[in-house]
Amino acid sequence: MNNPTISQTVNASCSGTDTAVGHASINKKAIAAAVAGNALEFYDFVIYAYFAVYIGKAFFPVAGEYGSLMAAVATFGVGFFARPLGGILIGAYADRAGRKPAMILTVALITIGTIGLAMTPSYQSIGVAAPIIVVICRLIQGLALGGEVGPATSLLIEAAPPHRRGFYSSWQIASQGIAVAVGGVLGVTLSLWLSAEQLQSWGWRVPFLLSLVLIPIVIYMRRELPETHEAAQERTSTEIVGVVLRDHKKVLVLGILLFASIGVASQIGNYMVSYAVQVLKLSAPIAQGSVLVGGVVTFVFALLGGLLSDRLGRRITNFIPRVILTLAIVPLFMWLVNAPDLVTLFTVNTVIAALTAMFATAGLVQIPELLPIAVRSTGLSLVYALGTAIFGGTTQFIVTWLIAVTNSPMAPAWYLAAISVVSLLAMLFLPESKNIDVRK
């Protein structure tokens, strides 16, 4: 028996039929399934960033203080550059076959990548095969994440009542906060319980292995989802991508520039663990603890940003936090560099996480609202994947390189400020989308 689509349920509820109760129930289920899968995938992705110092030494025995770390974060960036391909393939698949099968596929791919990372022996054990396997695993994870955001966000927006789309889609960013927070808890716990030698030997693998336990649950939840977009198998993926590139160039280009600062700010937040240990010389538990705080803050302020975007509109919720971050990031880093301790690190991470969560939420609902339902998943996947690949994917490598070359710990702040200005300019050319009918 086929499940009704959520859009059908929305129509029924608007016409006053008895399915209104089912609509509310389905929406909660859709949020839970999207959040669980998205959190799992981002958890696996950001865990790599958290433990980059240890992973670098395990798989990339490069000489120099920053050598192995730069090799590790470069491999982290490889996953970002696989995102556009994942966005094209899986995003178009979601517009052709439906949101639900695409969301199940992304979980399967992230599982393969995670198993590979968790089980690969070190360079010392199997030589050059080790970094090659790690790079392949990062590519697979990048494909999955590139194709995850478009279908899942499209489903949430299409499932939501018109006046709640911002709040529903905000759970995508909030779920990333959950992933960061859980990763932070594990990082702090492992740092406290294990010695540096144990962390280097096997401890960093534990968080990857733990995530595998949840995968059957997430797949089951997504299998039970109703569909929000009817399959259109007569269209090929090439045709769908062609429509996006031909008819929606403005949204695509401006969206990529809008997401540039989201990618950079998020990755600088993730990079703070390596930055705190390697540059500020703070202890690993303090560094991991700051990430935990950042994850909790992201969860709270993403939901707040969604509520505000529903009340005030997408543009103003996008604009104000961006301006504040652009103006505040350099003074905040000056404070952190001059007084590197728990309070300053936690404060800087909190400000970055809060402001980024708010404008990321507004952007994540605005872009898909500006795209028609027939190509929404593909368009959003391309915007998100290209924006995060070009800018977010290079962030950790660039700032690590800038710090090493300039000998200035202020490099992350100046880089983020510059990218934020570009995103602000792009945002000014995007129209308000709050009142658009997303079922067309």
Where are the regions a protein language model picked out?
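C-terminal ends and interior cores of transmembrane alpha-helices
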Residues: 108-126, 324-339
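Helix-to-loop junctions at the C-terminal end of transmembrane segments
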Residues: 87-98, 302-314
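Extracellular/periplasmic helix-loop-helix junction of adjacent transmembrane segments
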Residues: 52-85
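C-terminal transmembrane helical hairpin of 12-TM major facilitator-type secondary transporters
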Residues: 316-362
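A late C-terminal transmembrane helix in Major Facilitator Superfamily
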Residues: 373-405
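Extracytoplasmic gate region of multi-pass secondary transporters
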Residues: 49, 249-297, 392-396
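Glycine-rich segments within core transmembrane alpha-helices of 12-TM secondary carriers
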Residues: 167-191, 383-395
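Cytoplasmic membrane-interface "Motif A"-like loop-to-helix N-cap segments
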Residues: 96-108, 311-323
